[in-house]
């Protein structure tokens, strides 16, 4: 029982792992995932473009190798989804534009894929909205946990935010040392 989750570029890594290795994961969560590298280059500026076109990365611009940029963009790989997936995005995210994630969502729908998603509308916190130490973010994390638990079937699932927060903040207890 292995699930995978990540946010931002980690969300992109989550998606690409689910698409390329579907039998390795029971489920996945992608939070504010980088979803379309080509679209992203259009709004992130020349520094971001320089990272991708550098010889140690892709080594070419999208104009020189659009196929490679599509291969590395989850929105262009949507047909590969076989694993239960939850996606979150936020319309006021200044890092990963929600239109990029909406492209992924529309691509998954066009492929007839079964998945869950939520587009948060101007939720406080922008890019980090569900990772902040606030009651609203804790409630969102509990929803993410419940989605994952549905497939991972933990022996003692959390019943509420209080239990989730207790586990998150409980000091590690070393035994046998």
Regions flagged by a language model, labelled:
Residues 1-177:
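Active-site-proximal cap/loop segments of hydrolase catalytic domains
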